[in-house]
Amino acid sequence: MKTGKKLLVVVDMQNDFIYGRLGSKEAQEIVPAVREKIRHWDGDIMFTMDSHTLPLKDTFENHAIRPHCIEGTEGWKLVYDIKEIYDEHPGQSIKVKEKYNRFGITRGSTTRYIDYDYIEFVGTCTDICVISNALIARSENPHAEIHIDANCCAGTSPEMHEEALNVMSSCLIYVDR
């Protein structure tokens, strides 16, 4: 691993992606590992949160995927085990986003991928938001060492999770298994 400034990006660990409308057994299974990763992380941490408001905007996502992560609902909130750890790390940022990647941010800190030498991603969904953010990080910061902790990610299905990991690996992103 490179030495230098480190960032852990915790992607969309929200109730709707874990236990709710878009949840899965695989997503539920990663919660303890993500919690431990955050607890022992030695660097900055950024949490992203998918966020939609009512009435839903006329976007492809809102037509293609069931309504989810409606701001202010239980489904929108970070899962309890992750929120508890977030509360133990004052000063870490939450980026609320309306798109798959952090460039859709409407509120949040000014954390930028270019500011880091080592970036690691965990969370949901491997094949949507995790891959989007990881590829943008690769594009924004071609010199960073970028990692995906495959055991701390879950996709929309086990097959799509594996496909996304393969694509990221082919784009010079380290996939740690």
List where the protein language model places each region:
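A short glycine-rich beta-strand->turn/loop micro-motif centered on a GG-aromatic cluster
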Residues: 120-127, 143-158
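Structured adenosyl-cofactor binding patch, chiefly the S-adenosyl-L-methionine
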Residues: 137, 153-165
